[in-house]
């Protein structure tokens, strides 16, 4: 099973986390506060995968506040595709890469066998030796 969450603003979640960190630094004698995104995810099972049509760094700004294995996917470039579907495929953020990334995170955490990831890659035709789209 999995949960799908929609983030309306990575920036606002990041600001909240930074505000909480500042408050905790300035109030060492009080009970530490937790960022909103931390509160929402800390009791959830499994890794967190972020997939966005923006650059990876957009969601990476939440890494400090995600209390789980956190994998980010993003379109680190532009002008490479004539449709959104092709863009997502080229930059490895389409549904197949989201699935394989989630499975890879589960394998990394020891929750599933690595063979499950390899089988999904075969099923979806993912070439793991394809050049990194950011560098191509």
PLM regions and their residue ranges:
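Thiamine diphosphate
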Residues: 1-136
């Amino acid at each position: 099973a999995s949960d799908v969450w929609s983030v309306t603003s990575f920036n606002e979640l990041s600001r909240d986390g930074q505000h909480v960190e500042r408050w905790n630094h300035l109030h060492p004698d009080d009970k530490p506060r937790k960022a909103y995104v931390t509160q929402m995810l800390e009791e959830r099972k499994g890794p967190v995968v972020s997939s966005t049509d923006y650059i990876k760094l957009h969601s990476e700004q939440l890494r400090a506040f995600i209390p789980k294995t956190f994998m980010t996917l993003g379109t680190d470039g532009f002008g490479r595709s004539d449709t959104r579907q092709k863009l997502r495929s080229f930059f490895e953020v389409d549904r197949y890469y989201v699935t394989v990334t989630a499975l890879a995170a589960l394998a990394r955490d020891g929750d599933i066998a690595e063979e499950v990831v390899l089988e999904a890659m075969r099923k979806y035709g993912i070439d793991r030796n394809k050049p990194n789209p950011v560098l191509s």
